[in-house]
Swiss-Prot record:
GO terms for molecular function: fluoride channel activity; metal ion binding. It is a multi-pass membrane protein. Na(+) binds at residues 76, 79. One of its GO terms (cellular component) is plasma membrane. It holds the Pfam family CRCB. It comes from Cupriavidus necator (strain ATCC 17699 / DSM 428 / KCTC 22496 / NCIMB 10442 / H16 / Stanier 337) (Ralstonia eutropha). The gene is fluC. It comes from the Bacteria. Na(+) is not transported, but it plays an essential structural role and its presence is essential for fluoride channel function. The chain crosses the membrane at residues 6-26, 36-56, 69-89, 99-119. Its main location: membrane. This is Fluoride-specific ion channel FluC. The keyword Cell inner membrane applies.
Length: 126
Protein backbone atom coordinates (compact mmCIF):
# COMPACT_ATOMS: atom_id res chain seq x y z
CA UNK A 1 0.00 0.00 0.00
CA UNK A 2 1.35 3.38 -0.96
CA UNK A 3 1.20 6.64 0.99
CA UNK A 4 -2.21 7.52 -0.44
CA UNK A 5 -3.60 4.24 0.90
CA UNK A 6 -2.38 5.07 4.40
CA UNK A 7 -4.01 8.49 4.17
CA UNK A 8 -7.26 6.99 2.87
CA UNK A 9 -7.45 4.49 5.74
CA UNK A 10 -6.58 7.14 8.33
CA UNK A 11 -9.07 9.74 7.10
CA UNK A 12 -11.83 7.15 6.75
CA UNK A 13 -11.12 5.65 10.17
CA UNK A 14 -11.23 9.06 11.85
CA UNK A 15 -14.57 9.90 10.24
CA UNK A 16 -16.05 6.51 11.14
CA UNK A 17 -14.86 6.72 14.74
CA UNK A 18 -16.26 10.24 15.10
CA UNK A 19 -19.64 9.07 13.82
CA UNK A 20 -19.62 6.11 16.20
CA UNK A 21 -18.76 8.44 19.09
CA UNK A 22 -21.56 10.80 18.03
CA UNK A 23 -24.07 7.95 18.06
CA UNK A 24 -22.87 6.94 21.52
CA UNK A 25 -23.16 10.48 22.87
CA UNK A 26 -26.67 10.86 21.44
CA UNK A 27 -28.21 7.49 22.23
CA UNK A 28 -26.23 5.22 24.58
CA UNK A 29 -27.60 6.75 27.79
CA UNK A 30 -31.20 6.13 26.73
CA UNK A 31 -30.88 2.43 27.57
CA UNK A 32 -27.56 1.47 29.19
CA UNK A 33 -28.50 -2.22 29.08
CA UNK A 34 -28.64 -2.05 25.27
CA UNK A 35 -26.66 1.01 24.14
CA UNK A 36 -28.59 2.23 21.12
CA UNK A 37 -25.68 4.24 19.75
CA UNK A 38 -23.42 1.21 19.59
CA UNK A 39 -26.20 -0.89 18.11
CA UNK A 40 -26.89 1.81 15.52
CA UNK A 41 -23.21 1.96 14.58
CA UNK A 42 -22.99 -1.81 14.19
CA UNK A 43 -26.22 -2.16 12.23
CA UNK A 44 -25.47 0.83 10.01
CA UNK A 45 -21.94 -0.45 9.43
CA UNK A 46 -23.25 -3.88 8.45
CA UNK A 47 -25.69 -2.36 5.99
CA UNK A 48 -23.16 0.07 4.53
CA UNK A 49 -20.48 -2.59 4.08
CA UNK A 50 -22.97 -4.62 2.06
CA UNK A 51 -23.63 -1.61 -0.13
CA UNK A 52 -19.92 -0.85 -0.42
CA UNK A 53 -18.90 -4.40 -1.30
CA UNK A 54 -21.62 -4.51 -3.95
CA UNK A 55 -20.53 -1.14 -5.33
CA UNK A 56 -16.81 -1.88 -5.42
CA UNK A 57 -17.36 -5.34 -6.92
CA UNK A 58 -19.15 -3.69 -9.85
CA UNK A 59 -16.69 -0.79 -10.17
CA UNK A 60 -13.41 -2.70 -10.28
CA UNK A 61 -11.72 0.09 -12.23
CA UNK A 62 -11.77 2.52 -9.31
CA UNK A 63 -8.46 3.19 -7.58
CA UNK A 64 -8.04 0.83 -4.58
CA UNK A 65 -7.73 3.81 -2.24
CA UNK A 66 -11.48 4.43 -2.52
CA UNK A 67 -12.22 0.97 -1.14
CA UNK A 68 -9.62 1.49 1.58
CA UNK A 69 -11.22 4.83 2.49
CA UNK A 70 -14.78 3.47 2.59
CA UNK A 71 -14.51 -0.08 3.92
CA UNK A 72 -11.22 -0.45 5.76
CA UNK A 73 -11.15 3.14 7.00
CA UNK A 74 -14.64 4.55 7.49
CA UNK A 75 -16.54 1.35 8.22
CA UNK A 76 -13.63 -0.08 10.19
CA UNK A 77 -13.65 3.08 12.31
CA UNK A 78 -17.42 3.03 12.61
CA UNK A 79 -17.41 -0.62 13.63
CA UNK A 80 -15.39 -3.75 13.10
CA UNK A 81 -18.73 -5.52 13.09
CA UNK A 82 -19.18 -4.45 9.47
CA UNK A 83 -16.03 -6.29 8.41
CA UNK A 84 -17.09 -9.38 10.36
CA UNK A 85 -20.55 -9.27 8.77
CA UNK A 86 -19.19 -8.99 5.25
CA UNK A 87 -16.89 -11.97 5.83
CA UNK A 88 -19.71 -14.18 7.10
CA UNK A 89 -22.00 -13.14 4.23
CA UNK A 90 -19.23 -13.84 1.72
CA UNK A 91 -18.98 -17.37 3.15
CA UNK A 92 -22.75 -17.80 2.93
CA UNK A 93 -22.88 -16.55 -0.67
CA UNK A 94 -20.09 -18.97 -1.57
CA UNK A 95 -22.06 -21.82 0.03
CA UNK A 96 -19.40 -22.30 2.71
CA UNK A 97 -21.92 -22.74 5.52
CA UNK A 98 -19.50 -24.54 7.83
CA UNK A 99 -16.97 -21.73 7.57
CA UNK A 100 -19.71 -19.15 8.09
CA UNK A 101 -20.84 -20.97 11.24
CA UNK A 102 -17.30 -21.28 12.53
CA UNK A 103 -16.73 -17.60 11.78
CA UNK A 104 -19.80 -16.71 13.84
CA UNK A 105 -18.79 -18.98 16.69
CA UNK A 106 -15.19 -17.79 16.86
CA UNK A 107 -15.91 -14.08 16.51
CA UNK A 108 -18.96 -13.81 18.74
CA UNK A 109 -18.06 -16.50 21.24
CA UNK A 110 -14.40 -15.54 21.26
CA UNK A 111 -15.13 -11.85 21.73
CA UNK A 112 -17.46 -12.54 24.63
CA UNK A 113 -15.02 -14.93 26.28
CA UNK A 114 -12.06 -12.59 25.84
CA UNK A 115 -14.07 -9.64 27.14
CA UNK A 116 -14.87 -11.66 30.25
CA UNK A 117 -11.23 -12.75 30.49
CA UNK A 118 -10.02 -9.16 30.19
CA UNK A 119 -12.39 -8.07 32.95
CA UNK A 120 -11.22 -10.99 35.13
CA UNK A 121 -7.57 -10.07 34.47
CA UNK A 122 -8.19 -6.44 35.39
CA UNK A 123 -9.95 -7.40 38.59
CA UNK A 124 -7.18 -9.84 39.45
CA UNK A 125 -4.47 -7.20 38.98
CA UNK A 126 -6.35 -4.24 40.45
Amino acid sequence: MGPLGFVAVGVGAAAGAWLRWGFAVLWNAINPALPYGTLAANLLGGYLVGLAVGFFDTHAGLPPEWRLLAITGFLGGLTTFSTFSSEVVANLIAGDYGWAGLHLLLHLGGSLLLTAFGLWTYRLLA
